[in-house]
Amino acid sequence: VYTGTDTVEYLASGVPDRVFFATNESVLTTASRETLRKQAAWLRKNSDVTIVLEGHADERGTREYNLALGERRANSAKDYLMTYGISSNRISVLSYGKERPVDSGSNPLAWSKNRRSVTVKAN
């Protein structure tokens, strides 16, 4: 699972905006859970902020499969944030599947960067 930071942006200082997944997986890694804990802490302090969790996949697989996988990934992040007290009415889920790659390469490193869920401020 990709753990680099070259594609990461930040919701706030020290709060990364994205988590990464293994191939064909929507299970959160230890690193992903740590990032989401930071996001939850920031969201609790900023209770007026709503977010969209954007699920993404790499280029392999059909459009339909990757849209469903992206949705499962975003929902995994949503469920985890909710366990830390973030209300579901503050979180929207959207899947882009393979339509918005952060790296357009066709190799294992590019694919690992594209298997992600990105947290975006909605307001």
Regions found by a protein language model. Give the residues of each.
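Periplasmic peptidoglycan-binding/tethering modules of Gram-negative envelope proteins
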Residues: 1-50
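Periplasmic OmpA-like peptidoglycan-binding domain that tethers envelope proteins to the cell wall
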Residues: 54-123
